[in-house]
Amino acid sequence: MNTMTLTPGQLSLSQLYDVWRHPVQLRLDASAIDGINASVACVNDIVAEGRTAYGINTGFGLLAQTRIADEDLQNLQRSLVLSHAAGVGDPLDDAMVRLIMVLKINSLARGCSGIRLSVIEALIALVNAGVYPLIPAKGSVGASGDLAPLAHLSLMLLGEGKARWQGEWLPAQTALKKAGLEPVALAAKEGLALLNGTQASTAFALRGLFEAQELFASAVVCGALTTEAVLGSRRPFDARIHAARGQQGQIDVARLFRHLLTDTSAIAESHHHCHKVQDPYSLRCQPQVMGACLTQLRQTKEVLLAEANAVSDNPLVFADAGEVISGGNFHAEPVAMAADNLALAIAEIGALSERRIALMMDKHMSQLPPFLVKNGGVNSGFMIAQVTAAALASENKALAHPHSVDSLPTSANQEDHVSMAPAAGRRLWEMVANTRGIIAVEWLAACQGIDLREGLTSSPLLEQARQTLRERVAHYTQDRFFAPDIECATALLAQGALQRLVPDFM
C-alpha cells in the first residue's frame, strides 16, 4: 500500500492519480499543524467575544441572518450535516470516495477553515483504515460547494449513515468499531467547513482527465496503425508543417506520430513512390485535431490541479488578522468549464477515430477488402462494428453539451447562480466509456487491415501494438461473435496497453 505525506496545497497530479487508483496510507506533514491550530483559535475567540460570524454562530444560506445561541453551536453543526445529506443515485465507488476524502483533507489542512486537527486526523484515519462512506452520486449543483456529497462523507464522522469496509456495506457505527475508530462531536464552524467545498466536483473531473489521458494516447497509436493499414502518407507529420503554425499541441502530437511511424516500416516502403497526392482529413489532420484536444487536456490539468490544492470553504479564516470573511470559493465554475472543455476533447477524439474506422470500411478509400474481410457477402466483417462506433460517437455529441451554462437558483434565490460542475464531471465517465469503445473497434480494424497487407509489417512500436492485440484476439478469416472481441480490446485499453507505447505528453 502506498504511503503518502500530505503537505497541504502541494498535491501533484501523479499523487492524485495514485490516490484514485490505489488505497493509500496518509500522513499529514507537521508543517500544517500550526496553521490549523491558529485558525481554530481564531474561531474560538469569535465565539468567546460574542461576535457574529457566518457559519460560526449563524444559520446557513437564506437563514444566515439568524443568530445561534452559544449553547446550540455544537448541535447546529451536527444538524447541518444531517439535513444536508440528501443525495440520491448509485453510491460512488471506493476509488472516487477515497479521492474526494483526500481532496477534502488537503483543503481543510491549509489552515483557513477553523477545523480542529483532531477532526482532520479522524478523516485521515478513515482513509488509512479503508472505511469509505456511502456517497450517492447525485445531488450537488456545484455551489454552495458540493453540499450533499460532502455531507454524506461527513456523516461517517458522526457515526451516521453507511460505509463500505473490506468490501461490505455496514452501518457507520459498526464500520467504525471494526476499524477501531470512534465518532467525533463537531465544534463551531466544523460542519460547514466539512460540507463547503468543491472536492466532489473536482474528483469527478479528475477521473475524467485521468481516463482521457489514456484515451488520447490510445487514439494516437490507433491513428498511426490506421495510417499504415490504409497506406497513408507520413508527410503530413513533417515537423516543418507544424512549426509553421506554431500551435504547441499540434507540434507535440506530430512528434508522437513520428515516434510511432519510423522509417523501418515495410508497409511505408511499399508505397513510398505511389502517386496519391493527399489523404482524407481523418488521416492528414490528425496532428491538428488531436493537438487541439491535447491543448484542452493540458488546460484542464492546470485548472483541476489548482482546484485540488485550493481552499474552497466559506467563510475563510485568516488567523493572522483575526478575521473570518465570507466569499465564494465554493463556486465550482472553474471546474465546470474545465470539464466542459474536456468533454469536447473526448468527443473529438472519438469522432476522429470513428471516421478512420469508416475509412477502412470503404474499399475505394482503403484499398482493402470491403469491411476488412475476405469472401464479402458471405462474411459481413466489420460492417456492424463500425455502426457501433458511429452510435457511440453520436451519443458523445449530445453528452458534450456544456453544463456550466445551465444554472438553476437554489436556497430561495440566495444561491442564485450555480455551476453544475458535478454533472459536468460525472458525464465525462460515460463519454470516456463510449470513446474507449470506439478506439477498441479502430484497434481491431487497423490490425485486421495490416494483417491483410500480407507479408508486410509496420514499425517496431506499432507491431508491438498489433502483437498485444493478437495475443488475445485472433485475425478474422470469417465472421464470428464480435462483441467479446470489442470487450477484450476495451479492457486492454483501460489497462493502458497502448498508452505505454507513447512518451509522456502532458
Curated annotation (Swiss-Prot):
Primary subcellular site in the record, as a coarse category: cytoplasm
Gene Ontology cellular-component terms listed: cytoplasm
Cellular localization per UniProt: Cytoplasm
Pathway the protein contributes to: Amino-acid degradation; L-histidine degradation into L-glutamate; N-formimidoyl-L-glutamate from L-histidine: step 1/3
EC number: 4.3.1.3
Post-translational modification: Contains an active site 4-methylidene-imidazol-5-one (MIO), which is formed autocatalytically by cyclization and dehydration of residues Ala-Ser-Gly.
A Pfam family reported for this protein in Swiss-Prot or TrEMBL: Lyase_aromatic
Catalytically driven reaction(s): L-histidine = trans-urocanate + NH4(+)
Cross-link (5-imidazolinone (Ala-Gly)): A143-G145
Keywords: Cytoplasm, Histidine metabolism, Lyase
Residues recorded as bearing 2,3-didehydroalanine (Ser) in the entry: S144
Regions crossing the membrane: none
GO BP term (any one): L-histidine catabolic process to glutamate and formamide
GO MF term list: histidine ammonia-lyase activity
InterPro entries: Aromatic_Lyase, Fumarase/histidase_N, HutH, L-Aspartase-like, Phe/His_NH3-lyase_AS
Family classification: Belongs to the PAL/histidase family.
Protein name in UniProt: Histidine ammonia-lyase
